[in-house]
């Protein structure tokens, strides 16, 4: 019951503060100071007062964690900074090599790292503005994830309103959503009692709970959020461990096993301690993450295209089991790679029922000598990917034959080829092969290919599933009424996509070549081919020796191009695209002009005011230059715009010539660009 004789607003605020404090003590600190019945009484009083005074309800009130009705679907969230994955270490030697690279790059020995358990859950990013939770999303592809705000609000270890003071006006808190082992067991017991299929493991339970359209279901799953960092917040401190301390002070849960360690020996010792305690932990883990603690050092180390150079995940040893191979099947991936997959008698491994295991490639099948009917040892590498580690040859049945790679793609019938420098066999069906369709279409529409704005993964998936698009040429037959009928499309988005498709009909020969997705043909190679041959017909009809004469095209790339165009299906795709109106201007090899910057390597950094970095890159490459993403002793020039950062400092230390934007413009004008 609500108290009488007091100011309702003041009492509501007092109740909210008290409930937030108890939530923090219970769900973050694991140190409650009142009984559940007392907590329930406080919440009941707050809810009663807010019911009497609905004008006083605020989104960050503890009573508003659970939305009242299911959502119709998940929207998208664009992360302020990409949520990159981590490189993995599967053996101690991998960790030692990582430490060596870091020490060498920084000139430090030893390096101080922050070590933390790699929780086996779902990574999420939670955005706060002025101290209040406004948005939450999954990792997704690293740039765009699914909006799960209402579900994340139900997690009691996630503050709806930040504690303390000193937090930035905007920040994205990154972390892992997990479910305790004990809560997972109770959840599965209840699902069995309700006649539902139990979850295979805690990670699946956590991920499935976050993707419920009804947040009331999520609220009943007792999820926990552990933060492991922050983005888009500016410089909060000098080190990662200080940032974690600040996040803890603002109300977030930081894993109690996070520690600072010194050098490789400290990393090893932490790993062994955590491994020894693994079965006693309340949460599932699948490894240890090591991060360079000093944030200036992180900036100096930088990133690769997919992962930071200052962090690594050392995977824990997998658990193994014995089972029997029913048969070996060739599986065609989205890039055309054909992977032998062993179909197994189902067996439990690390809490998961395993019925298939990858054999990677033909060399691996031969090395392990896996055959149909064999008894094998199976493990989940890093507790995730099932693989066969050994064959018990003593139990091999008589007449078991070695497995052979098929000569034709099991999906489309195209030639299967192993390029000279590759371990994998590939289907040469390219854009024609149904198994490669979605991946090929996404590549075809990507920014550096035909740049079809609005044709993302979810749209392509629907178009393929509904049979609306079987080849790239089908894209150009799509009409507004067809697109508007897709999920989360709408009239305006359909109009925009139709316009983008129409615009994409007018492209360039290098972009078209790149869009075809030929193995080893990137944007630079595509441009070299266009410049060397001048027309698509000349490229399609060239043999391997003629192709290999192209600058930057060696025998392996020439082989891939020749086999791609030797496949009749691929020629039919090209013909269909031209019939659909895709055009470009041919390049006259005789009029390509000089390449005055051939052999010179440039690096671009910072913000340019007169052009984008992509435009600057294109202009330099048109003059024969190579544009790299990192500074090294082989770099000839660094073009430094505003806020150039660590690349400028490294260039100066290596004696690399630095050009400002004005000097770049002068260089381009000198050569007629």
UniProtKB/Swiss-Prot annotation:
Keywords: DNA damage, DNA repair, DNA replication, Ligase, Magnesium, Manganese, Metal-binding, NAD, Zinc
InterPro entries the UniProt entry points to: BRCT_dom (IPR001357), BRCT_dom_sf (IPR036420), DisA/LigA_HHH (IPR041663), DNA_ligase (IPR001679), DNA_ligase_CS (IPR033136), DNAligase_adenylation (IPR013839), DNAligase_N (IPR013840), Hlx-hairpin-Hlx_DNA-bd_motif (IPR003583)
Active site: 118 (n6-amp-lysine intermediate)
Reactions performed catalytically: NAD(+) + (deoxyribonucleotide)n-3'-hydroxyl + 5'-phospho-(deoxyribonucleotide)m = (deoxyribonucleotide)n+m + AMP + beta-nicotinamide D-nucleotide
GO molecular function, one term: DNA ligase (NAD+) activity
Cofactor(s), names only, from the UniProt record: Mg(2+); Mn(2+)
GO terms classed as biological process: DNA repair; DNA replication
Occurrences of domain BRCT (ranges): 592-673
CDD domains tied to this protein: BRCT_DNA_ligase_like (cd17748), LIGANc (cd00114)
GO CC annotation: cytosol
Positions that bind NAD(+): 36-40, 85-86, 116, 139, 176, 291, 315
Coiled coil: none
Keyword Secreted assigned: no
EC top class named in words: ligase
E.C. designation(s): 6.5.1.2
Family stated for the protein in its record: Belongs to the NAD-dependent DNA ligase family. LigA subfamily.
HAMAP family in alphabetical order: DNA_ligase_A
Role summary: DNA ligase that catalyzes the formation of phosphodiester linkages between 5'-phosphoryl and 3'-hydroxyl groups in double-stranded DNA using NAD as a coenzyme and as the energy source for the reaction. It is essential for DNA replication and repair of damaged DNA.
Protein name in UniProt: DNA ligase
Organism this protein belongs to: Alkalilimnicola ehrlichii (strain ATCC BAA-1101 / DSM 17681 / MLHE-1)
């Amino acid at each position: 019951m609500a108290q009488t004789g007091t100011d309702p607003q003041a009492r509501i605020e007092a109740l909210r503060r008290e409930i937030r404090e108890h939530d923090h003590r219970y769900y973050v600190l694991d140190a409650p100071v009142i009984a559940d019945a007392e907590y329930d009484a406080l919440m009941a009083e707050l809810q009663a007062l807010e019911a009497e005074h609905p004008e006083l309800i605020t989104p960050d009130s503890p009573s508003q964690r659970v939305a009242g009705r299911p959502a119709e679907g998940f929207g998208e969230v664009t992360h302020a900074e990409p949520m990159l994955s981590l490189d993995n270490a599967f053996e101690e030697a991998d960790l030692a090599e990582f430490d060596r690279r870091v020490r060498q790059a920084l000139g430090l020995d030893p390096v101080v790292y922050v070590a933390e358990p790699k929780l086996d859950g779902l990574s999420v990013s939670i955005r706060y503005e002025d101290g209040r939770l406004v948005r939450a999303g999954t990792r997704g592809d690293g740039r765009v994830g699914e909006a799960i705000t209402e579900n994340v609000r139900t997690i009691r270890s996630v503050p709806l309103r930040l504690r303390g003071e000193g937090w930035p006006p905007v920040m994205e808190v990154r972390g892992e959503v997990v479910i305790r082992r004990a809560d997972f067991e109770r959840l599965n017991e209840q699902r069995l009692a309700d006649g539902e299929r139990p979850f295979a493991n805690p990670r699946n339970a956590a991920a499935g709970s976050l993707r419920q359209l009804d947040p009331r279901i999520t609220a009943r799953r007792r999820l926990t959020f552990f933060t492991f960092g922050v983005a888009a917040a500016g410089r909060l401190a000098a080190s990662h461990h200080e940032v974690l301390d600040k996040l803890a002070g603002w109300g977030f849960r930081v894993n109690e096993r996070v520690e600072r360690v010194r050098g490789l020996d400290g990393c090893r010792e932490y790993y062994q301690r955590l491994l020894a305690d693994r079965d006693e932990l309340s949460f599932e883990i699948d490894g240890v993450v090591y991060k360079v603690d000093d944030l200036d050092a992180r900036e100096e180390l930088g990133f690769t295209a997919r992962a930071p150079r200052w962090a690594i995940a050392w995977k824990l040893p997998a658990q193994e089991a014995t089972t029997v191979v029913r048969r070996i099947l060739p599986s065609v991936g989205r890039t055309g790679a054909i992977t032998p997959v062993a179909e197994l008698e189902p067996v439990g491994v690390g809490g998961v029922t395993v019925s298939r295991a990858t054999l990677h490639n033909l060399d691996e099948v031969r090395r392990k000598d896996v055959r149909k009917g064999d008894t094998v040892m199976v493990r989940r590498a890093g507790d995730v990917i099932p693989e066969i580690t050994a064959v018990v040859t003593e139990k091999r049945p008589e007449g078991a034959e070695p497995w052979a790679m098929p000569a034709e793609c099991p999906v489309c019938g195209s030639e299967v080829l192993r390029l000279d420098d590759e371990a994998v066999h590939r289907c040469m069906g390219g854009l024609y092969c149904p198994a490669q369709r979605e991946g090929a279409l996404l590549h075809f529409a990507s920014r550096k290919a035909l740049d079809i704005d609005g044709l993302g993964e979810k749209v392509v998936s629907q178009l393929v599933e509904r049979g609306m698009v079987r080849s790239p040429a089908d894209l150009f037959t799509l009409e507004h009424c067809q697109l508007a009928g897709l999920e989360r499309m709408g009239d305006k988005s359909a109009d925009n996509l139709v316009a983008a498709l129409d615009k994409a009909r007018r492209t360039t020969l290098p972009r078209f070549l790149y869009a075809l997705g030929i193995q080893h043909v990137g944007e630079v190679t595509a441009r070299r081919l266009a410049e060397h041959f001048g027309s698509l017909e000349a490229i399609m009809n060239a043999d391997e020796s003629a192709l290999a004469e192209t600058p930057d095209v060696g025998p392996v790339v020439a082989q891939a191009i020749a086999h791609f165009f030797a496949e009749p299906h691929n020629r039919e795709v090209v013909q269909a695209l031209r019939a659909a109106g895709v055009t470009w201007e041919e390049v006259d090899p005789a009029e390509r002009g000089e390449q005055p910057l051939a052999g010179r390597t440039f690096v671009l950094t910072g913000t340019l005011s007169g052009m984008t970095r992509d435009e600057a890159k294109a202009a330099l490459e048109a003059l024969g230059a190579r544009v790299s993403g990192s500074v090294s002793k082989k770099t000839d020039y660094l073009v430094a715009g505003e806020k150039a950062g660590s690349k400028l400092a490294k260039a100066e230390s290596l004696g690399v010539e630095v050009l400002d934007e004005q000097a770049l413009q002068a260089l381009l004008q000198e050569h007629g660009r």
